[in-house]
Design a protein with these regions (language model features):
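A cross-kingdom marker for long, charged
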Residues: 221-299
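Bacterial N-terminal signal peptides that target proteins for export
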Residues: 1-9
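Extended amphipathic alpha-helical interaction segments
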Residues: 150-237
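Bacterial signal peptide processing site
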Residues: 21-24
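Short, solvent-exposed segments of well-ordered alpha helices
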Residues: 81-88, 92, 107, 144-151, ...
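C-terminal motif of bacterial Sec signal peptides marking the signal peptidase cleavage site
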Residues: 16-19
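N-terminal Sec/ER secretory leader and immediately downstream segment
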Residues: 30-143
Length: 299
């Protein structure tokens, strides 16, 4: 089944939450971000509208402006790749390493980016998706590694991720695509949950809370791929879904719409999400457990 990355509906799903609170747990009230939707009237039935799947870079944009210290210990050990024996394990961990590359690039750690890039390149060959990233892409990435250009590398890591996405989409390999997306999302969420303690005013924490929307998006995407292995992987995300579904959401009656000059309709308002330190810590524990089963190849 085909999944068009740049189809009719593009949903901007960003905003997360986290940092350090005092002895009394507090709830952070987070407004759902505006949703920007490009509307093309009567072009296709609903079944042909596919949600855009986020790349790991979407999570880490906030780190570039936040006062976040780099923590290499968060990354997946590159030596683990040698023990990955199944297509499922390799695809999930391709996503994991793609998220790691986005993280180190976002914080300008060029020295750690190069070996991660080589690991991704190796996995792409084993998954038979090396054609998704031709020699021009590899050369551009290597040039930016050599020039210590983190901003361009961050952009290229995003491009590489979507090149793999498009290649798998166009070649009817939705199972591998779904696994890569899940692996990248779980690793990205684990990283951002561990980059600082809970703080009810942190923009990073805001990102974490808003991942409830990204998860909904991911589940819709995965549900369109008929594959038993992927279904089993998605089932492991049930505790994360349950936690997000348990958050208190207050609907905002002030809902607005506007249209930009280029025809993009922007929906404002929406709802407010309460995300406490307890929610944060529970999510951190759940995600760490899922991530552990991915990187050791047992999921």
């Amino acid at each position: 089944m085909k999944f068009n990355i740049l189809n009719l509906l593009s949903i901007t799903l960003v905003s997360f939450l986290m940092s350090c609170a005092g002895s009394e747990p507090t709830d952070v009230q987070v407004e759902d971000p505006a949703i920007e939707v490009e509307v093309e009237v009567a072009e296709a039935p609903i079944d042909d509208i596919f949600y855009q799947v986020p790349s790991p870079n979407d999570l880490f944009n906030v780190l570039k402006d936040a006062d976040i210290s780099y923590n290499k210990e968060i990354l997946n050990d590159l030596s683990r790749v040698e023990s990955l024996n199944s297509k499922k394990a390799k695809a999930l961990n391709f996503g994991v390493y793609a998220a790691d590359l986005a993280y180190v690039s976002s914080l300008g750690q060029i020295g750690d980016a190069s070996p991660i890039f080589e690991t991704i390149r190796s996995l792409s060959k084993e998954l038979e998706i090396e054609n998704a990233m031709n020699d021009v892409i590899y050369s551009r990435i290597q040039d930016n590694l050599d020039a210590s250009n983190p901003d361009s590398l961050f952009s290229l890591s995003n491009e590489t991720y979507y090149k793999a996405y498009a290649y798998l989409d166009n070649n009817d390999r939705g199972d591998v695509l779904g696994m890569i997306v899940v692996g990248g999302w779980v690793e990205g969420l684990n990283i951002i949950l561990n980059c600082q303690d809970y703080n009810d005013s942190s923009e990073v924490v805001q990102r974490i809370a808003d991942q409830r929307l990204t998860l909904e998006n991911l589940l819709v995407f995965a549900s369109r791929i008929q594959n038993e292995d992927l279904d089993n992987i998605i089932a492991e995300l049930a505790p994360v879904e349950e936690l997000y579904n348990g958050l208190v959401v207050t609907e905002d009656s002030d809902f607005t719409t506007d249209e930009s000059e280029d025809g993009v309709v922007v929906f404002g308002g929406g709802s407010t999400v309460s995300f406490s330190e307890e929610d944060f810590n529970n999510l951190k524990s759940i995600v760490a457990e899922i991530r552990a089963s991915i990187i050791d190849g047992t999921l």
